[in-house]
């Protein structure tokens, strides 16, 4: 990336009917994500967490061939801090720091976002791109889409949090099969395994995603967000600790405007009108 280059069109953003749409716009590069697009995605998910005007997030990509083929390593990251003249080209620990500040942060930003995140899977998701699918809350896939755990096929080990996410979705033995062999996984097979929620014709992907996203965006946002956190924590906490967290969140949720509206609408026998707080 040349100094001063305008890269704003490589990640398209818009908010429509309470839905934040994020579109990776690098179809000519397989929608691979360079560091500056990755960092914008991290910021977008973190900001969506706090933004009362955003009540659901959709992540998709341009074109119909690739959703995301992982990190674009052809774009070098800028050097952070100072560099003495006698420093080696590659300092021990630099890869660790790059991982921690990179796709691992992106995975965490998606998982920790209070708002529900839908991936509209428009094509191939490979390597780190598959993490974006696994980290999302819901996935709608075009019928021509596929996922590839390409790491071992290139002599690499899975990164970007894939080893954390994949077995939680498909189970340990199936996760090992997918990672050890790196075979293509069709959208239909991904749906059978529970990675994908719904498969639709490619021409219907945007409309199907819009329907789900706007349905979520018109729902009780806090209740959805706290439900997301409980489900994520269920595989991490002991039974005792999870039940304690559940009780605390139920208590907090009863103080929301939407919780009060839910009770009132039930008593008054009318549809609820959710505000999102």
Model-derived features with residue positions:
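Conserved CoA-thioester-binding segment of acyl-CoA-metabolizing enzymes
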Residues: 1-64, 78
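Terminal peptide-recognition signature
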Residues: 22, 26, 41, 59, ...
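Glycine- (often His-adjacent) and acidic-residue-rich active-site loop
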Residues: 61-106, 155
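Short, active-site-adjacent cap segments at secondary-structure transitions
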Residues: 64-68, 126-127, 231
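Crotonase-fold acyl-CoA enzyme core
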Residues: 108-224, 251-264, 270, 277
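Short, charged, surface-exposed hinge/linker loops at domain edges
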Residues: 228-237
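Short beta-strand->loop
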Residues: 238-242
